Amino acid sequence: MQWNVPRTMSRLALRTFVEAQKARLFDHHWRIKGPLLVHRGEYRVAWTPHLRKQWLHLSAVQCLAKQRNLLDAQPPQLGTLRQERWEQDILSKRVLSSSSTSQETPSEKKEETDPLQDKSISLYQRFKKTFRQYGKVLIPVHLITSGIWFGTFYYATIKGVNVIPFLEVIGLPDSIVDILKNSQSGNALTAYAMFKIATPARYTVTLGGTSFTVKYLRSHGYMSTPPPVKEYLQGRMEETKELITEKMEETKDRLTEKLQETKGKVSFKKKVE
């Protein structure tokens, strides 16, 4: 029995090492593979069961030196890789967000009809849309028709056509009617008042003249015919895809360059150490 006790004790020999108390617990806890036995002034003694090795005592200086080497070797590489992945995710999100906000996708756009043929909107809206799309044609047509309208009203007032009763019938304010009656330049003011009252008719004539002019210019090859809506949408979609792919390729190239620079720096540090 006395011989068996030392023999069993030798088989259950324990390996320990000493670690400085001042080191942080979470940084060095992974090196301790057994429960804590002794906790005194400057050292903590931990033990782990081992079958062959006996008690092993390491100085606190050696433990700290090994720990610092491991921390210097591993964390920079892991940190840089995580940082580069984080930057890659942020840049990809920015590219997608900028491409989605700067350009509207053609699928989301409503199919816009020709404002000259669209009867579902008001006269003023048709005039505005026609001005945006056919401004070069609408402006000269509108100036010519407006000149004709004003000239007609002015000629009528000069020839003695009294339009004052007509203005009173349509409900023009009395102050304006009195100004037109008593002013020395009554003919011009009267013509201008009639010109403003006839605004809906003037806009209708302008839109009709613009439509006729556009058809004439297209038939003679002076204006290009707009493409069909489907072809236009397909072209816009292809352009948007090309822009997005170009931006993604640029960001990938930048990220690969940064990763290569980071790897080179990490390898250089390892060689120096």
Swiss-Prot record:
Signal peptide: none annotated. Disulfide bonds: none annotated. Residues 94-116 are annotated as: Disordered. Expressed in skeletal muscle, heart, brain but not in bone. The keyword Transmembrane applies. The keyword Hydrolase does not apply. Keywords: Coiled coil, Cytoplasm, Membrane, Mitochondrion, Transmembrane, Transmembrane helix. Residues 106-116 have a biased composition (Basic and acidic residues). Disruption phenotype: Embryonic lethality in homozygotes mice after embryonic day 9.5. Tamoxifen-inducible Fam210a homozygous knockout mice exhibit decreased grip strength, lean mass of all limbs, bone mineral density, bone biomechanical strength, and elevated osteoclast activity with microarchitectural deterioration of trabecular and cortical bones. GO terms for cellular component: cytoplasm; membrane; mitochondrion. Residues 118-230 form the DUF1279 domain. The chain crosses the membrane at residues 138-158. Residues 233-269 form a coiled coil. It is a single-pass membrane protein. Belongs to the FAM210 family. May play a role in the structure and strength of both muscle and bone. Interacts with ATAD3A. This is Protein FAM210A. The lineage of its organism: Eukaryota, Metazoa, Chordata, Craniata, Vertebrata. The gene is Fam210a.
